[in-house]
Amino acid sequence: MNKFCVAVLVCAWSVATFAVPARVGHILDGDTFSAAVSLDADTTVSVRVRLRNVDTPEMNGDCEYERARAVAARDRLAEIIPVGSTVELSNVKDDKYLGRIDANVKNAAGDDVGEVLIREKFGRKYNGGRRKPWCK
């Protein structure tokens, strides 16, 4: 069912040029969170959202440095978009991992969440492909 909901969301949003509100459910790591999105007055779906064009360290990273930075990035994301807060999703596309979407995300203050993480050195720009290693 969740894969179907993601497919419906991606198809609907692929032609949309507007932002869609979503309620933050759970922060998974520094660049991924779950969100509840209302399709209509009676239907809300939960989706996993990955911040578009951002890479943060992995929670199960290759070295202690990466794992520590991953916790810091996750905690910072939780400060920028607290659980229960409303965010705006735009430029929504299907992610390479089924069941997840990529999107630009703005918080309640109107800040681009990915840009904040990059500016504050919790993440770096990412345009797909092979990730640069975080371990030295």
Feature locations, PLM:
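Small beta-barrel nucleic-acid-binding modules, primarily SNase/OB-fold domains
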Residues: K3-C5, W13-K136
